[in-house]
């Protein structure tokens, strides 16, 4: 069982119609990691945090911000397709430290990272699109579908209770397509 928490990056006015404040994605991820840091599922060694991002630049920015927190006994590890095989394999080797893994949607379905108890979902991904007009393949950043959000949530809670923080609102989630086109 996984508890899903919504922590949108925009704060609305009390009437829900006006954006009062907006945080950037890295700040939202840092806040979510700090929130999850104090929580450990009862009787579990699944204490690692898996954060989903749309690309390498976002991962590097978040890695810098999370490393600056200097959380004790923690290592921050990137995971994306262009990493060398040796760097990717670091994610699958448990160390004595708690890990924060920053990944693209490569970690959504194709592999299982051991020790994940928590997920932070930014709600975006690079989605492959082919333009019939220009005959060019593109990778724009788009909101993920409900099915992709469910896949991301399912990365935790496999061996014990888990928590997924989504950096978007319930209303945003409900408005998303069921599946990626």
Locations of the language-model features?
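P-loop NTPase motor module signature
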Residues: 1-181
